[in-house]
């Protein structure tokens, strides 16, 4: 039997989906903008 594909790691999670990573790129900023407009409690991770 193969192992599960999701092996949680806080560091990896933050490095790929964290706020700083999102705010670095144009598209990431667009994501944050959309989530703010929608009223999300958590903008990133």
Swiss-Prot record:
Q: What is this protein called?
A: Large ribosomal subunit protein bL34
**Which superkingdom heads the taxonomic lineage of this protein's source?**
Bacteria
InterPro entries cross-referenced by the UniProt entry = Ribosomal_bL34
Can you name one GO molecular function term for this protein?
Answer: structural constituent of ribosome
Q: Which residues form the signal peptide?
A: none
| The family this protein is said to belong to | Belongs to the bacterial ribosomal protein bL34 family.
Q: Key word Ribosomal protein present in the record? A: yes
Q: Where is the composition biased (Basic residues)?
A: 32-45
Q: Where is this region: Disordered?
A: 1-45
Q: Might you name a Gene Ontology BP term for this protein?
A: translation
- Alphabetical list of HAMAP family matching this protein: Ribosomal_bL34 (MF_00391)
Q: Which GO terms describe its cellular component?
A: ribonucleoprotein complex; ribosome
Keyword field: Ribonucleoprotein, Ribosomal protein
